[in-house]
Amino acid sequence: MSIALKQVFNKDKTFRPKRKFEPGTQRFELHKRAQASLNSGVDLKAAVQLPSGEDQNDWVAVHVVDFFNRINLIYGTICEFCTERTCPVMSGGPKYEYRWQDDLKYKKPTALPAPQYMNLLMDWIEVQINNEEIFPTCVGVPFPKNFLQICKKILCRLFRVFVHVYIHHFDRVIVMGAEAHVNTCYKHFYYFVTEMNLIDRKELEPLKEMTSRMCH
């Protein structure tokens, strides 16, 4: 990553502190392995495959946290251009509108401006990944039985951030010289969720054409 790009993707651009794994734990080692997959020249399609002998839930957990951090960072770089005026509804072009529901304040799917949707989304994901009953940090503590279902919901909603950024704000990404970095993050995400079967194909439709060109 160039110095200029590092300045674009700095920690001050994120909405919230990054969730990290404790050094010396198995998940920290898996996290480092997942991080290394973004090094230049790495075969991303191969890098996302579950390592031999490793637990699927551990592998998914470190990637969900990692993708949350990265996608939060990507949105943070363009959030000043994503306003209630420019994006009055959270959408991915004219065909796709995303409504928010959390069974708390928003018990029914509700149309919201994109920045409000994004803030609710990031807050909601942060609550999930900081919940020890869902993402246990202590070695030996089991994941809940519905862990993969929760992760599927998180990843499905994170994909919508990519959809919105690519369709409505990619001109800003290009101006910042961050196109290659965002594309690599997207490819990593796409290969992972399809390899692990974590997102329904119909949810991937908004970026299908771009994905077919980018992810062979």
From Swiss-Prot:
Induction and repression of expression: Expression at transcriptional level is activated by the expression of the neighboring long non-coding RNA (lncRNA) EMICERI.
Entry annotated with the keyword Coiled coil: no
Annotated GO CC locations: cytoplasm; nucleus
Pfam families cross-referenced by the UniProt entry: Mob1_phocein (PF03637)
Tree of life domain: Eukaryota
The keyword Membrane is assigned to this record: no
Alphabetized PANTHER family for the sequence: MPS ONE BINDER KINASE ACTIVATOR-LIKE MOB (PTHR22599)
Name of the protein described by the UniProt record: MOB kinase activator 3B
UniProt organism field: Homo sapiens
Originating gene: MOB3B
